[in-house]
Amino acid sequence: MKIKKGDTVQVITGKDKGKQGKVIAAYPRDERVLVEGVNRVKKHTKAGPTAGGSQAGGIVTTEAPIHVSNVQLVVEKDGNKVVTRVGYRFDDEGNKIRVAKRTGEDI
Protein backbone atom coordinates (compact mmCIF):
# COMPACT_ATOMS: atom_id res chain seq x y z
CA MET A 1 0.00 0.00 0.00
CA LYS A 2 1.39 3.39 -0.98
CA ILE A 3 0.05 5.36 2.01
CA LYS A 4 1.85 4.76 5.31
CA LYS A 5 1.34 5.65 8.97
CA GLY A 6 2.46 9.23 9.64
CA ASP A 7 1.74 10.53 6.12
CA THR A 8 -0.37 13.64 5.64
CA VAL A 9 -3.25 12.96 3.27
CA GLN A 10 -6.22 14.79 1.77
CA VAL A 11 -9.64 13.20 1.28
CA ILE A 12 -10.61 13.41 -2.40
CA THR A 13 -14.17 12.06 -2.26
CA GLY A 14 -17.04 11.55 0.15
CA LYS A 15 -18.56 13.60 2.97
CA ASP A 16 -15.14 14.81 4.18
CA LYS A 17 -13.84 15.83 0.74
CA GLY A 18 -11.04 18.41 0.98
CA LYS A 19 -10.13 17.69 4.61
CA GLN A 20 -6.50 16.98 5.44
CA GLY A 21 -5.16 14.90 8.28
CA LYS A 22 -2.38 12.65 9.48
CA VAL A 23 -2.64 8.88 9.01
CA ILE A 24 -2.97 7.33 12.49
CA ALA A 25 -3.01 3.71 11.33
CA ALA A 26 -2.84 1.79 8.05
CA TYR A 27 -4.57 -1.53 7.41
CA PRO A 28 -2.94 -2.98 4.25
CA ARG A 29 -4.98 -6.20 4.27
CA ASP A 30 -8.23 -4.22 4.12
CA GLU A 31 -6.74 -1.38 2.01
CA ARG A 32 -7.98 1.18 4.54
CA VAL A 33 -6.40 4.00 6.53
CA LEU A 34 -7.41 5.77 9.74
CA VAL A 35 -7.06 9.54 9.29
CA GLU A 36 -7.04 12.01 12.18
CA GLY A 37 -10.22 14.14 12.26
CA VAL A 38 -11.78 12.49 9.19
CA ASN A 39 -14.79 10.14 8.92
CA ARG A 40 -15.88 10.68 12.51
CA VAL A 41 -18.63 8.33 13.66
CA LYS A 42 -20.61 8.00 16.87
CA LYS A 43 -20.41 4.72 18.78
CA HIS A 44 -22.87 3.78 21.47
CA THR A 45 -20.98 2.09 24.31
CA LYS A 46 -22.34 0.10 27.19
CA ALA A 47 -21.17 0.85 30.73
CA GLY A 48 -19.05 -1.88 32.23
CA PRO A 49 -16.08 -2.71 34.41
CA THR A 50 -12.51 -2.24 33.18
CA ALA A 51 -9.12 -3.07 34.68
CA GLY A 52 -8.62 0.45 36.05
CA GLY A 53 -12.13 1.01 37.33
CA SER A 54 -15.57 1.58 35.90
CA GLN A 55 -16.12 2.53 32.26
CA ALA A 56 -18.89 5.05 31.66
CA GLY A 57 -21.40 4.26 28.95
CA GLY A 58 -22.70 6.74 26.42
CA ILE A 59 -22.05 8.02 22.94
CA VAL A 60 -18.39 8.25 21.92
CA THR A 61 -17.21 10.04 18.77
CA THR A 62 -14.23 8.39 17.07
CA GLU A 63 -12.60 8.06 13.64
CA ALA A 64 -13.45 5.16 11.34
CA PRO A 65 -11.15 3.80 8.60
CA ILE A 66 -11.68 4.95 5.00
CA HIS A 67 -10.57 3.26 1.79
CA VAL A 68 -7.10 4.20 0.58
CA SER A 69 -8.46 5.07 -2.90
CA ASN A 70 -10.36 7.98 -1.32
CA VAL A 71 -7.20 9.78 -0.14
CA GLN A 72 -4.13 11.29 -1.80
CA LEU A 73 -0.76 12.09 -0.30
CA VAL A 74 0.10 15.71 0.53
CA VAL A 75 3.75 16.77 0.14
CA GLU A 76 5.40 20.14 0.65
CA LYS A 77 7.23 21.85 -2.20
CA ASP A 78 8.61 25.39 -1.96
CA GLY A 79 6.47 26.07 1.10
CA ASN A 80 3.24 25.00 -0.64
CA LYS A 81 1.26 21.85 0.03
CA VAL A 82 0.80 19.76 -3.11
CA VAL A 83 -1.58 16.81 -3.51
CA THR A 84 0.08 14.00 -5.45
CA ARG A 85 -0.03 10.36 -6.37
CA VAL A 86 2.69 7.99 -5.21
CA GLY A 87 5.06 5.99 -7.38
CA TYR A 88 8.10 3.84 -6.73
CA ARG A 89 11.68 3.66 -7.94
CA PHE A 90 14.68 1.57 -6.99
CA ASP A 91 17.98 3.10 -5.89
CA ASP A 92 21.46 1.80 -6.75
CA GLU A 93 21.38 -0.73 -3.91
CA GLY A 94 17.99 -2.12 -4.98
CA ASN A 95 15.96 -0.49 -2.22
CA LYS A 96 12.39 0.53 -3.06
CA ILE A 97 11.79 4.28 -2.59
CA ARG A 98 8.46 6.13 -2.70
CA VAL A 99 8.33 9.06 -5.13
CA ALA A 100 5.80 11.91 -5.39
CA LYS A 101 4.63 11.76 -9.00
CA ARG A 102 3.72 15.44 -9.27
CA THR A 103 6.98 16.82 -7.87
CA GLY A 104 9.31 13.93 -8.73
CA GLU A 105 10.90 14.09 -5.27
CA ASP A 106 11.58 11.20 -2.91
CA ILE A 107 9.22 10.87 0.03
Curated annotation (Swiss-Prot):
Assigned GO CC terms: ribonucleoprotein complex; ribosome
GO molecular function, one term: structural constituent of ribosome
Assembly and interaction partners: Part of the 50S ribosomal subunit.
PANTHER family, sorted: MITOCHONDRIAL RIBOSOMAL PROTEIN L24
Stated family: Belongs to the universal ribosomal protein uL24 family.
A Pfam family hit: ribosomal_L24
Protein name: Large ribosomal subunit protein uL24
Coiled coil feature spans: none
GO biological process, one term: translation
InterPro entries, per the entry: KOW (IPR005824), Rib_uL2_dom2 (IPR014722), Ribosomal_uL24 (IPR003256), Ribosomal_uL24_CS (IPR005825), Ribosomal_uL24_KOW (IPR041988), Translation_prot_SH3-like_sf (IPR008991)
Its biological purpose: One of two assembly initiator proteins, it binds directly to the 5'-end of the 23S rRNA, where it nucleates assembly of the 50S subunit. One of the proteins that surrounds the polypeptide exit tunnel on the outside of the subunit.
